[in-house]
């Protein structure tokens, strides 16, 4: 795996950015975390006048071999059907991408079945689903490397079009299981605190899911490095997302993070290069059990808390207007001086 050269944010701008915000024609700190967000984006871009251009939302879809062990309420074919739905415009991610002004890219990373009937779905299929990681590694080292490269390639293309805002979504029945395993290894939290209902499991279903994942942990006896965790337990769509997020941070893009699954991807990215988190904006706190703990482990502040747990990147896109508001505040508001208002605080 290559080294990701993510530039550190420009911390020398902290004081001048705060001074600029405090001279805007509003009471001090009255916009709360929106002001912090504006400061973060200024530091990401290295300027007191940040801008947001050409937001792109990429959806990676793939299947997971561990689904054969009954870790999900939904059948595997839902991955195939919903990926078609993305392309046909009926899915929430499709609707929200149009609503919030994101260019939408849909990628077959490893779905079981032929998706060529929808030409707008880009075929980057590694294989028809991963192997069952309860029994063997989910993918080969070569497949893992290919996934990272594919994610990077899409971001390079987006950047060439002027994109500096990236949102990543996923579709893959069974991928909350991978996310739980990554969370367990990377945070050190007990597996039981990392496993939730996913697509709607009963209490008995969650207990069974925990048993399957515990068996996968017992099988793996290697060192839990990021490379090994991606290879052993990863999904093709999730490893592509890791590559995309890291490549976006290398280009100083604002990276919008969705819920539980994409936060696990962000967690993985942060263990590959800790600078990644300086470019990550967490859209919302998911209803999925464990997400709040994962956010806390990364020191992340989600912008929304609406009880959502859909996936697809919809929570990230819904938070984008808040990001736009933060940038507009910093770059378009008048100052006390320009607006003829007495500045009544220090």
Question: Which residues does each predicted region cover?
Answer:
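N-terminal loops that bind phosphate or other acidic moieties
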Residues: 1-346
